[in-house]
């Protein structure tokens, strides 16, 4: 163990005393995550990390609390297991109701990214390489809203932002590249809810669909200021089910009473 030595001079007595103090906490300088997605492609959007930390267990942000990561890259030091769904203990961060997380990069070595147990707020949170999901709302009341402002995600085989609770998920000024679905309302949870998505200022590249919603449960997705390149569908509707053994069935795509946007809301780059 390293120690800092403090020398206290007692000139009147002609003596010196040595006191051992524990070292300050250290954050390992991160290997470069900048400009790297999980598939090896490059992007100028992922910010440089200020360090890295592999957590031995999920870091919980208490109800109403906040955590500012200072752009450190956090993960769990484990390999991604693909689309095999993990649980809360596999997440990097778990945010209790009313909590907030800001200025964090979720590194590539994890199974689950961030779990939200009630309305929460994410500001400038980035995912270097998505595993099963980048972010999941596990619980939320019908009248509540979770807010994601800024940040981005890269290299998602399927979903980026998953909504399993009720109420609204609002996402603004978010970048996503190489993905399956940016947002998805759970299609076959044991308990199904009406869910709403508000997407504004999204820049999306190389993906299947921006939003997947269940119109038979009253879901809606509203889009404004969207810029896309290589994205197949803006909004896809499904017939959801509360039978976890069944898969939801796609039943439509494009503007509708459920998928709310016009051609002026979407710009192709």
Please provide the spans of the model-predicted regions:
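Fungal secretory targeting signals
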Residues: 1-23, 28
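Short stretches within intrinsically disordered, low-complexity N-terminal or propeptide regions
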Residues: 12-14, 32, 223
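Beta-strand-rich luminal/extracellular ectodomains of secretory-pathway glycoproteins
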Residues: 27-36
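Extracellular beta-rich repeat passengers
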Residues: 35-59, 66, 71-86, 114-269
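LRR N-terminal entry segment and analogous cap-like coil->beta motifs
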Residues: 64-78, 87-91, 95-112
């Amino acid at each position: 163990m390293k120690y800092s030595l403090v020398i206290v001079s007692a000139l009147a007595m002609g003596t010196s005393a040595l006191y051992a103090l524990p070292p300050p906490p250290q954050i390992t300088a991160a290997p470069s995550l900048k400009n790297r997605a999980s598939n090896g492609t490059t992007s100028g959007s992922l910010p440089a990390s200020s360090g890295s930390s592999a957590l031995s267990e999920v870091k919980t942000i208490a109800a109403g609390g906040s955590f500012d990561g200072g752009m450190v890259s956090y993960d769990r030091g484990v390999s991604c297991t693909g689309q095999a769904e993990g649980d809360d203990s596999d997440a990097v961060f778990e945010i209790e109701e009313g909590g907030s997380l800001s200025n964090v990069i979720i590194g590539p070595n994890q199974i689950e990214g961030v779990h939200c147990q009630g309305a929460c707020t994410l500001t400038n949170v980035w995912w270097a390489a998505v595993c099963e999901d980048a972010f999941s709302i596990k619980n939320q009341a019908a009248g509540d809203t979770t807010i994601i402002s800024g940040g981005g995600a890269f290299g998602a085989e399927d979903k980026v932002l998953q909504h399993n609770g009720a109420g609204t998920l609002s996402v603004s000024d978010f970048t996503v590249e190489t993905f399956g679905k940016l947002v998805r309302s759970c299609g076959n949870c044991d308990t199904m809810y009406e869910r709403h998505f508000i997407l504004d200022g999204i820049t999306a590249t190389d993906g299947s669909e921006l939003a997947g919603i269940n119109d038979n449960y009253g879901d809606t997705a509203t889009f404004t200021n969207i810029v896309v390149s290589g994205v197949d569908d803006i909004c896809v509707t499904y017939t959801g089910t509360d039978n976890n053994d069944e898969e939801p069935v796609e039943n439509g795509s494009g503007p509708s009473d459920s998928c709310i946007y016009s051609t002026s809301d979407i710009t192709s780059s």
